């Protein structure tokens, strides 16, 4: 690369240029500020008062033109009521740069603005103040512009007004033209240095609040990235801060201990007026204390009581006014600083241009090989060029700016490395996820619900460990080849973070495969246990839970030995963790069995009715019971009912442990007429999680069963009564029937037709008797007679003559037929 020539690249500008770009911008501003559109569109703008005149006199007394600051504040009762609940804002910047116009648009004030006829001269003299906001909660300070020709080289007044604004303002705006950024003199960077120094010496206490400095970049240019402007300004600020000699108690304090910085920009007022107004309205929201993004944060409030503001301002101004140590740096130092800064900026720009190729590579998402080697070489070359060009200037300034340039270059490389590290981290993360997923999927194929063999999972953890070690080795090599020496310490955390992520991914893969193995085992054990306990649930016997517990204990003993072996071979779990996981698996499987029992609640009424019928309505051979007069219906009924209700009580609770058999959820009144009842409260010592049928469900089911029991009991009693009738016919009645019916008997025997008819009817009666259908025949005959009589009466009811008579002897009864039908059924 060609040697950088100070003459070629860093030529000095004429002292009195005829037409600079800045003057052109000023001309635009003069036209803009005097445009009719520059009138603040508001009904009641706040004009404010001049609290410090151009000669430095404070407004401590009333004059014909204005009241004193004290009387002005006293005329604002709404402001006095606020106490310390208000904020103050001021603005610094070059003369005729549109500061007053900006304040007028932002805060509904009416500060005096530039008149084109008068040329670019001072519009704001000294310091003006106004109250803004619907509740007078904002104090606005408009300061005289800097670098004006009226004061020539007398910078003392500018510095004093700047220091004054810093002492009272929560927020201080610095108004800059975008084309002045990076120009030390035009952007008032030297003034900021003095402000910082004197602010520390005069005002900063341990408890003093911070000040927020907001840089407002005016006439924003589309081809200049705002982020770059922001970085340039912050770099200037940090360079200035590095040169500030603070008091001893703040020797190591960073600038953000005393100041915060924010940046915003606005388009050209004249050329882009609509955009300007729109963005100012957006900016205005930042000055609303109720907005969550407000500039007026509590930590910036100077906490000056409203009624003491005038006294405070006067004392502060007198303190600043009497200060005698406000001289500019020496001309030689200024020249050295300006030229070294200019050369540094040029070197930085060349460096930035030279690495655009690498920036494009990273922007496309590609990793730069040998990142450390490439950029270390370029930084060394840039610093060497800087030393060659600046060797004529003050050594201390050269070294100071060189250190700042080095920080800039390293900062730029650091930002690129952040992208490089991001891409490397993304690539290594993708690799980790891909390789671990492949291994996990291979072992997931071992799943077989009907079989569980823990030995198939044995090599999984070993393969994951080998893969993890290879990835960590590759990551360390790639990282070492990319990290420049000056970033070695800063990037340790990033390296360790990625290593930690690899470890987390490894543990996650082991955990996921462990979960797969647990799920495999659970499905296998459930598929083994459920078919074996289902018959016991359907049989509904008193030893149901005992048999279920036996099945579960046997399967658990055999199965969980396999699971424990699987945990030891597949994962790195310790003994306590394995025991905990086995306990969780047992709980999950028992919950699954409990769900199986709960699902059978729907079938429970049918199972209980079947149980009752098997004991009461069927004999030991499974045939329908034929009730004889000698049968003890009550004993059989109560025995069947009690056992059925015992089965119901067993289903009320998940009796997976032997101690669970002691809990009762129903009250059975043995051998009595009272129906069973559900116990409303949970038995002492019982676990609510094991309850299968709650109180309401038990109560409803008992009511259903009681109706079923009573119905079966009544049917049995009726059948028994019918069977007793055939044993109650007297012998003398049989003799009388034979004696008086002998002639009819002979007539039947001698008449073939009557004889055959008698045999048919008699055979039918005999069969009905043997089958115990007498009661059914009796009910059916009653039904036919009732239906015939009902039909006849209803027919006669339709005849007007018989209607009154029929209504008296045969009232309407719609339920009569239904009851008869139900009786027949």
UniProtKB/Swiss-Prot annotation:
Membrane topology of the entry: Multi-pass membrane protein
Ranges of the Lumenal topological domain: 750-752
Coiled coil: 373-397
EC number, as in UniProt: 3.6.5.-
UniProt region (Disordered), positions on chain: 1-21
Enzyme kind, highest EC tier: hydrolase
Protein name per its UniProtKB record: Protein SEY1 homolog 2
Main location group: endoplasmic reticulum
Residues of the GB1/RHD3-type G domain: 83-305
Role according to the record: Probable GTP-binding protein that may be involved in cell development.
One Pfam entry name: RHD3_GTPase
Family membership: Belongs to the TRAFAC class dynamin-like GTPase superfamily. GB1/RHD3 GTPase family. RHD3 subfamily.
Domain of life of the organism encoding this protein: Eukaryota
């Amino acid at each position: 690369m060609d040697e950088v020539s100070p003459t070629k690249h860093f030529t000095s500008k004429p002292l009195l240029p005829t037409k600079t770009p800045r003057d052109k911008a000023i001309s635009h501003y003069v036209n803009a500020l005097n445009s009719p559109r520059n009138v603040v569109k508001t009904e009641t703008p706040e004009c404010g008062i001049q609290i410090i005149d151009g000669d430095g006199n404070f407004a401590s007394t009333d004059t014909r033109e204005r009241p004193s600051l004290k009387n002005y504040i006293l005329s604002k009762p709404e402001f006095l009521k606020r106490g310390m609940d208000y904020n103050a804002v001021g603005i610094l910047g070059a003369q005729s740069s549109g500061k007053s116009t900006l304040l007028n648009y932002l805060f509904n004030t009416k500060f005096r603005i530039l008149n084109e006829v008068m040329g670019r001269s001072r519009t704001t003299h000294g310091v003006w103040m106004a109250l803004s906001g619907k509740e007078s909660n904002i104090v606005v300070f408009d300061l005289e512009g800097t670098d004006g020709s009226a004061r020539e080289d007398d910078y003392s007044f500018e510095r004093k007004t700047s220091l004054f604004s810093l002492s009272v303002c929560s927020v201080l705006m610095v108004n800059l033209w975008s084309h002045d950024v990076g120009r030390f003199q035009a952007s008032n960077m030297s003034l900021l240095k003095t402000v910082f120094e004197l602010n520390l010496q005069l005002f900063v206490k341990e408890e003093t609040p911070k000040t927020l400095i907001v840089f407002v970049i005016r006439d924003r240019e589309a081809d200049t990235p705002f982020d770059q402007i922001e970085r340039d300004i912050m770099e200037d600020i940090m360079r200035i801060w590095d040169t500030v000699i603070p008091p001893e108690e703040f020797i190591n304090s960073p600038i953000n201990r005393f100041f915060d910085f924010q940046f915003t920009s606005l388009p050209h007022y004249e050329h882009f007026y609509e955009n300007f107004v729109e963005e100012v309205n957006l900016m205005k929201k930042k000055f609303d204390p109720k907005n969550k993004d407000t500039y007026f944060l509590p930590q910036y409030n100077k906490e000056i009581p409203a009624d003491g503001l005038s006294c405070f301002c006067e004392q502060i101004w007198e303190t600043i006014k009497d200060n005698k140590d406000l001289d500019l740096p020496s001309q030689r130092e200024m020249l050295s600083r300006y030229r070294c800064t200019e050369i540094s900026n040029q070197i930085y720009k060349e460096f930035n241009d030279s690495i655009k190729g690498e920036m494009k590579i990273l922007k496309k998402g590609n990793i730069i090989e040998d990142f450390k080697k490439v950029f270390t070489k370029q930084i060394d070359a840039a610093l060497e060029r800087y030393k060659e060009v600046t060797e004529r200037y003050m050594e201390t300034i050269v070294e100071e700016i060189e250190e700042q340039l080095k920080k800039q270059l390293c900062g730029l490389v650091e930002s690129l490395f952040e992208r490089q590290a991001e891409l490397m981290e993304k690539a290594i993360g993708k690799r980790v996820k891909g390789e671990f997923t492949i291994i996990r999927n291979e072992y997931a194929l071992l799943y077989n619900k009907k079989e569980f063999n823990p030995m198939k999972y044995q090599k999984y953890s070993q393969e994951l460990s080998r893969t993890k070690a290879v990835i960590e080795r590759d990551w360390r090599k790639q990282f070492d080849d990319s990290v420049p020496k000056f970033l070695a310490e800063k990037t340790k955390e990033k390296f360790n973070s990625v290593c930690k992520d690899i470890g987390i991914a490894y543990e996650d893969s082991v955990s996921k495969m462990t979960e797969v193995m647990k799920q495999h085992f659970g499905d296998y054990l459930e598929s083994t246990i459920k078919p074996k306990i289902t018959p016991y649930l359907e049989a509904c016997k008193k030893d149901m839970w005992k048999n279920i517990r036996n099945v579960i204990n046997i399967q658990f003993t055999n199965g969980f030995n396999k699971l424990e072996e699987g945990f030891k071979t597949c994962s790195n779990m310790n003994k306590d963790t394995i025991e905990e996981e086995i306990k969780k698996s047992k709980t999950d499987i028992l919950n699954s069995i409990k769900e199986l029992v709960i699902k059978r609640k729907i079938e429970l009424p049918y199972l209980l009715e079947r149980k009752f019928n098997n004991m009461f309505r069927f004999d030991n051979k499974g045939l329908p019971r034929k009730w004889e007069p000698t049968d003890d219906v009550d004993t059989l009924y109560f025995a069947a009912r009690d056992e059925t209700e015992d089965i119901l009580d067993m289903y009320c609770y998940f009796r997976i442990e032997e101690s669970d058999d002691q809990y009762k959820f129903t009250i059975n009144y043995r051998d009595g007429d009272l129906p069973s009842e559900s116990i409303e409260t949970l038995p002492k010592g019982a676990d609510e999680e094991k309850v299968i049928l709650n109180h309401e469900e038990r109560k409803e089911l008992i009511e259903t069963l009681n109706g079923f029991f009573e119905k079966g009991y009544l049917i049995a009693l009726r059948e028994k009564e019918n069977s007793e009738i055939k044993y109650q016919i007297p012998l003398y009645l049989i003799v009388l029937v034979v004696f008086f019916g002998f002639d009819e008997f002979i007539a039947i025997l001698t008449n073939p037709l009557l004889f055959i008819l008698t045999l048919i009817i008699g055979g039918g009666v005999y069969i009905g008797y043997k089958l115990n259908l007498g009661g059914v025949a009796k009910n059916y005959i009653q039904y036919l007679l009732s239906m015939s009589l009902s039909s006849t009466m209803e027919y006669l009811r339709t005849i007007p003559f018989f209607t009154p008579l029929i209504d008296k002897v045969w009232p309407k009864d719609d339920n009569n037929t239904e009851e008869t039908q139900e009786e027949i059924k």
